[in-house]
């Protein structure tokens, strides 16, 4: 099976359009610029999304990029339930380490929980969150702190999923 890993540029990671003043000099610099469904369709033009897995390194605007990805698949005639892949979507580590967040913690966790709910019901082969400790360590933590924060983040995602009414066995296997 073939897989692709998509790294987005800084404006996309921060939720900015490429013509925003803060995007100047950053568009396409360290990844691809995707700011619309049209751009997502260009990115995957000629690539059958039902035949590959796609890993997307995106956090703050993950729900928007997921919507673009689903729309692109549907425009290819692919049912979202057939999609395989992973979103990084680890917003909690953004607050403690990487600092690429858009919304405050509470609304961010609401979005994450909504994505867990949608994907667990509609995209059974899709990993909704890839919990990452790497950035925490790179931000200066010890190995023990990296492990502690990473596990705490994972437990928090599970707790939010359960509190929203999901059964742990319906969504936790799709966390990586």
Descriptions of predicted regions:
Residues 1-176:
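Catalytic alpha/beta active-site cores
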């Amino acid at each position: 099976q073939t897989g692709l890993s998509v790294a987005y540029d800084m404006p996309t990671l921060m939720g900015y359009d490429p013509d925003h003043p803060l995007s100047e000099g950053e568009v396409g610099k360290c990844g691809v610029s995707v700011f619309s469904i049209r751009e997502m369709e260009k990115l995957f033009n000629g690539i059958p999304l039902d035949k590959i897995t796609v890993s997307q390194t995106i956090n703050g605007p993950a729900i928007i990029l997921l919507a673009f990805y689903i729309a692109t698949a549907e425009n290819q005639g692919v049912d979202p339930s057939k999609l395989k892949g992973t979103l990084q979507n680890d917003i909690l580590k953004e607050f403690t380490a990487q600092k690429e967040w858009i919304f405050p913690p509470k609304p961010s966790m609401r979005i994450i929980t909504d994505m867990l709910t949608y994907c667990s019901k509609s995209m059974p082969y899709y990993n909704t969150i890839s919990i990452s400790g790497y950035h925490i360590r790179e931000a200066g933590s010890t190995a023990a702190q990296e492990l502690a924060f990473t596990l705490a983040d994972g437990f928090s995602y599970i707790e939010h999923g359960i509190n929203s009414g999901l059964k742990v066995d319906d969504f936790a296997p799709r966390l990586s």
